[in-house]
Regions:
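Acyl-donor binding region in acyl/amide transferases
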Residues: 59-127
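A conserved beta-strand-loop-helix scaffold within acyl/acetyltransferase catalytic domains
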Residues: 2-60, 106-211
Length: 211
């Protein structure tokens, strides 16, 4: 039988290796001021099996609390039964503190098999607010990309191919290059009326200290 335990950031980092940057201790600590409290949790029996980082804010435990997605960090392959038990323990942890729980999983492209299992478990344990459509295409499995898209998409593709442009790989360790990339995104968001939630300084701190 497993139990849930709250750890310090250092303890958590020594045990769990994140599958993506948003589940890392470094990224979490960089954004600590965006939550009222942080909960580094380990779910284990004789072995540490599941870790999750939650930000507490406005009566809710959120994973993530300041990122596109979060979810569990798993040590090795775990059974569905253990995954279900882990979610039950997490729900009990939140209920004991009179807190709601919100978990946003990463896109399936990150780990289709494991994330499909988490989706199955979570949809049976908690309410699903929304499911994002996944538009990624695995080009390694497709011989001719143009043959799987419709006529209007092919037309747009050919138009884009006829526009002269260069692809330049920028240096993420160079503030000037990061600023250049940030400005492209900022202008795009501004022209489309979408909010930009991170300042250049926040992006630079993330890139230089975490990524």
């Amino acid at each position: 039988m497993m139990q849930i335990e709250r750890l310090s950031p250092d303890e958590y980092a020594k045990i769990y290796t994140p599958q993506h940057v948003f589940n890392s201790v470094d990224f979490t600590e960089l954004n600590r001021d965006k939550a009222e409290d942080l909960h580094y949790l380990s779910i284990h029996d004789t072995k540490h099996r599941f870790g999750i980082i939650l930000g507490e804010r406005n009566g809710m435990l959120r994973s993530p609390f300041s990122a596109p997605f979060g979810g569990f960090t798993t040590r090795g392959v775990q059974t569905l039964e253990r995954m279900e038990e882990a979610v039950d323990l997490l729900l009990a942890y939140a209920a004991e503190r009179s807190l709601q729980l919100v978990v946003t999983l990463q896109p399936l492209v990150y780990d289709e098999t494991q994330l499909s299992k988490w989706t199955s478990v979570l949809t049976r344990k908690i309410n699903v607010r929304c499911t994002d459509l996944n538009y990624h295409v695995d080009l390694q499995r497709i011989a001719d990309y143009e043959q799987i898209i419709d006529r209007s998409a092919r037309k747009n593709l050919h138009h884009a191919q006829n526009v002269p442009f260069n692809l330049i790989k920028l240096n993420s360790n160079d503030l000037k290059d990061v600023t250049r990339a940030y400005e492209v995104i900022r202008r795009n968001r501004e022209e489309r009326g979408f909010p930009l939630r991170m300042t250049l300084e926040q992006v630079w701190q993330t890139v230089s200290n975490v990524v």
